[in-house]
Structures are given as C-alpha cells and as structure tokens.
Amino acid sequence: MKKVYTLVIGLLATGMSFAQQNFILSHIDHRGFINLSGGVSLPVKSFMKGDPSAPSDIVALRGSSMQVAAGYRLTRRLGVMGSFTNCLNEAGTQKLVENIQKSNPEGGWTASGGTWNCSHLLAGPYMTFNAGIWMFDARIMGGYSWIQRPSTELKGNFYEVPLSVKTNQTRSSSFSAGGGVGIRCKITRSFALALHADYVGTRATFDNLTSTLTIGEEKGEEKMREVHPIGSLSINGGLSFLF
C-alpha cells in the first residue's frame, strides 16, 4: 500500500506542477515571434489565369518546403508579419509523353525533368487569438516570387529516326499573394511548437526559353514562351521563438 500511496502522491504533485506551469505560460504576454519550420509543398490550383497562347505540359509534383517567418502584434488582436518560403518540387513530365504518343505511339518515348525551385517573400497583416498556452493566427499577405523552371528532355524515335527535345532551365519573377493559418503551443517562457499552412498564388512568365531539337544528326534551336499559373500549399511544422 505504501508504494501505491507514494505513486498517487507523485502523480498528484506532477499534475499540480504541470498545471502551475501552464497557468504561468498562459499569462505571459508575448507580442512578437520568429518561426523556423519545414514540411511539404503541395501543388494546387492557382487563382491566376494562364495564357492559351503560351501553354505548357510541365507540372510540379509534391515536394518539400522551408519557411522563416517573423511577426509583431501591434494591438490585442492585430499585427504585421513577413515570411520567406522556399519550395522544391520535382517536375512532372508525363503529359509530354502522352501528347507525342498520340501521333507516334511506337516511338518508345521517355521524358525527364529537373526540380521546380520557388521562393516567395511575403508580408501583410495577421490576426491572433490566445487560449491559455495555445495561440491561433490567420493572415493575408502579398509580395514577390522567384520561380525557376526546370530543364526538361523528351526523347524517342520518330518513325525510326532518333529525336530529342531539350528545354533549358530558366528563371522568372512575379508578384504573388496568399494567406495562411497557424497554431502555436507554448512549451517554455520563450519557445513554442508551431504548425501552419500557407497558400501562395502567382503567375510565372518565361519569355526566352531555349528549346533544342535534335533529329538524327540535325540540330536546331527555337525560342519559345511559357506561362505557368502557380498555386502552392505549404504545410510546415517547427519551432517558434517568442518575445
């Protein structure tokens, strides 16, 4: 029985200590934060429109995301914040193969591509709500994006003649807009665990893409234009420094 009493007393003491810590943390008023987080990048539909005269068969697949964000609360609920997000997504080239197979299904076509590299620098207002050790945020932001289109290559045999089409890697920049929601849980006086989801939409225009066509021993280059409406949903988790 002595061991049971000792265990019960120990559990009660631990529970009281945990409750006391939560009470203290919930009454500390933090006005600012700095987040460092990482997670997944999911390509989603963009609210930007494409250009029918400059289509593309290259898409982005699921990838990784990293974000640094900082904010400061100006009033009880409202504040301003900024973020820098970088997303890396492998290129999806299956549509290139599907389109050429419609006219030449026996060519043994294959396609490969590099990685989309998208960086977003955004700023805007945010609203926050506190509930004990929990903090909930919602934000609307705008800013600038830098998009790197990956290099791609399509190759096969066009009526028994070797054919390849290589398109070079290139960069573009454009205005962007988005928003997000987040939740933070205080674990010490200065740190919290953070989980957030952010959407960014932009439209990247590539005016000077170089496409190299090789048929047998013959080779030629062509300048082309592509417009990519880009939508990205980043779901990240990490650590938040509170001040």
What name fits each language-model region?
Residues 1-30:
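Cleavable N-terminal export/targeting peptides
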Residues 32, 64, 78, 119-121, ...:
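Hydrophobic core residues within well-ordered beta-strands of beta-rich domains
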Residues 36-40, 68-72, 84-86, 123-129, ...:
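Residues on the lipid-exposed face of transmembrane beta-strands in outer-membrane beta-barrel proteins
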Residues 43-61, 85-120, 145-174, 202-236:
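Extracellular/periplasm-exposed beta-strand and loop segments of Gram-negative cell-envelope proteins
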Residues 185-194, 203-209:
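Substrate-binding/catalytic groove segments of enzymes
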